[in-house]
Amino acid sequence: ETTLSLSSANADEVIQKRILAKNNGAQNFLEADYPNHENDIDSMLVFEDSPELRLYNSAQNYADVYPFVPYQFNLLANSLTQISKHSIQGANLSRGERSLLAFFKETAERNADKESDALVSLDQFYPSLEKWLNETDNAKVIKQAEENSRIVPDPDDQFNIAVLKVLFMIKYVDQNIKPTLNNITNLLIRSVNEDKLALRKQVEMALKILISENLIRQNLKSFVFQTDEEQEVTRLINNIDLNETDVDNKLAVDIFDANVGR
C-alpha cells in the first residue's frame, strides 16, 4: 500500500486515482446526476468562518471524489496531524505508519453499499482513527459515552455519539473550521438530499445532551470536546457555590475599601 504523508499537497489526487476511480458507467452517471443536486449542495454546505473548506467545483469533480466531499481531504489530514501531536499513540500517524490513503480506503469500503445519493460524513472516518487511538484518554471518553444510557438510550441510535466523534476530530483544528452549530451540522450531512433543518435540530438536541453530561462545553457560538482533564476543570468550576448575596457583599466591601483608601 502506498504511504501517503498527511501533509501531501496532492493527497486528493492520489486518493482519487487509487481509491475512487470509477468505471465509465458510474463516472458518467454521477456527472449527469450532479446538476440535479448542485444548487442544493451549494446552499446546504455553507461553512461559517471557514473559507478554506472546498466544495465541488464541477460535475467531473463531484464524480471524481464521490462519495466524499472535497473539504474532507485537507480537513482530515490536518485533523490527524494535530491529533498525533496530542497523543502518544497518535504519533504513529505523523510518521506515515498510517496513511491518509488507508483512512479513505476503509471508509469508502464501509460505505460501498449505500445509495447513489449518499455522502460520507466526517464521523464515518472515526473507526479507522479509533484503531490508533487505542486506550488513549480521548478514546476512553468516547467509549464511555457509548456506554452511557443518557447519551445512547437506544443502541440503534448512535447519533449523539456521531456528534461527539466529530467534535473530537475537529478539536485541534479550529484554525480550519469553527465548531459552530451550523458547521457541525454540515460535517454530519450524509446525503445530497439531506433535510438540513431537521438535521440541525437533531444536532442541537445532541449538543445539549453532551453538555449536560460534561463531555463538551459551549464557548460563545462554539462547542468544544472536553478531555478528561478539561471535564474535571469544568466540574470544579460548576461546583463553586457563589450566590448573588456573596457577590453583592464582596462588591460592597471592595467599594468601601476603595472609598476609605485601604
Predicted feature residues:
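Short secondary-structure boundary/capping segments
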Residues: 1, 18-23, 82-83, 109-110, ...
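The catalytic "switch" region of P-loop NTPases
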Residues: 1-50, 209
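Short alpha-helical scaffolding segments that buttress acidic/His motifs in well-ordered protein cores
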Residues: 15, 76, 164-167
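C-terminal helical "lid" subdomain and adjoining coupling/linker elements of P-loop NTPases
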Residues: 26-32, 40-162, 173-180, 190-199, ...
